[in-house]
């Protein structure tokens, strides 16, 4: 993949861009194998590759420059802005949106936020696209509501230019820190979710709810989880850290009792909507802390699926799972190091299957799916 910004030394987000893609995949597989070298793995599956460019469905653009000439991209260490509208990770459909936004920002008088001076209003633009129908969600991250009325007044022009913007919102992030978003979301459109579909499973994307940024690889990841779970023939499972329900809804059958737990109420609303659309009557989702939920329930499901943040599930939840002793644990991780730490805590489980998914090409990061089986199962 050729990138002008990388070649010019202005952006190094894709640290491995100079490495041929086939070798990137080999290096990631070697890294994962080394991390698990102290464990017996019954079956290694071949790594799931990614497209090398235009694979992302989301852009997180720092807004810098001036209101007359905004830059959309990132900040360098010296505080100067780098425009990344030509980033080859984004699909072609993003280019027209970025161009229109550069005209809209001065129309609406949205002064870019200056980190050095702690002045200005517009901090980020967050763009997400649905592969299902091409609809997009655009979020303006503002320091305050000072420019909200101006934004509303100018918005019809933007909507006329970009009818694909089905969901538009403002997020208020008042803190002078490198925090992407605040708690308050103000919708500027009647539609508040994007519709998506992976492997025939309807999914919904809301502001502030996690959704994978590489949809083709995410689709393969969910399909692999479904195939492994269905081969086990389980009829009761928990989906902890479930997000919008991608894993659980892929694994669920009409006969299965599935409980999905996620801290985000918005994500749970999306998961419930998907379950209703699929006609799954034995599926329930609740907005709770996953660890607290597990600790409060004495019933033991046949399988627990976990998809935690980078820190992993941690010692407390591992200890609980050892005591609860479900026959199977399906662990999806975006940080193999924390996953291996958790596996070492799950002393009563052996590793049955492992597969790497290259969710983040041109970087050292990857996703991994691991099936753990209780030694006595």
Swiss-Prot record:
Coiled-coil segments on the chain, per record: none
Pfam family, one: tRNA_U5-meth_tr
Keywords assigned by UniProt, alphabetized: 4Fe-4S, Iron, Iron-sulfur, Metal-binding, Methyltransferase, rRNA processing, S-adenosyl-L-methionine, Transferase
Binding site for S-adenosyl-L-methionine: 212, 241, 262, 307
E.C. numbers: 2.1.1.189
Gene Ontology biological process terms in this record: rRNA base methylation
EC top class named in words: transferase
Segments traversing the membrane: none
Residues engaged in binding [4Fe-4S] cluster: 3, 11, 14, 87
UniProt entry tagged with the keyword S-adenosyl-L-methionine: yes
Protein's UniProt keywords contain Nuclease: no
Catalytic reaction annotation: uridine(747) in 23S rRNA + S-adenosyl-L-methionine = 5-methyluridine(747) in 23S rRNA + S-adenosyl-L-homocysteine + H(+)
GO molecular function: 4 iron, 4 sulfur cluster binding; iron ion binding; rRNA (uridine-C5-)-methyltransferase activity
Catalytic residue list: 334 (nucleophile)
PANTHER family linked to this entry: RNA M5U METHYLTRANSFERASE, TRNA (URACIL(54)-C(5))-METHYLTRANSFERASE
HAMAP family, alphabetized: 23SrRNA_methyltr_RlmC (MF_01012)
Similarity comment: Belongs to the class I-like SAM-binding methyltransferase superfamily. RNA M5U methyltransferase family. RlmC subfamily.
Protein function: Catalyzes the formation of 5-methyl-uridine at position 747 (m5U747) in 23S rRNA.
NCBIfam families with a match to the protein in the record: meth_trns_rumB (TIGR02085), rumA (TIGR00479)
Protein name: 23S rRNA (uracil(747)-C(5))-methyltransferase RlmC
Organism expressing this protein natively: Edwardsiella ictaluri (strain 93-146)
Gene: rlmC
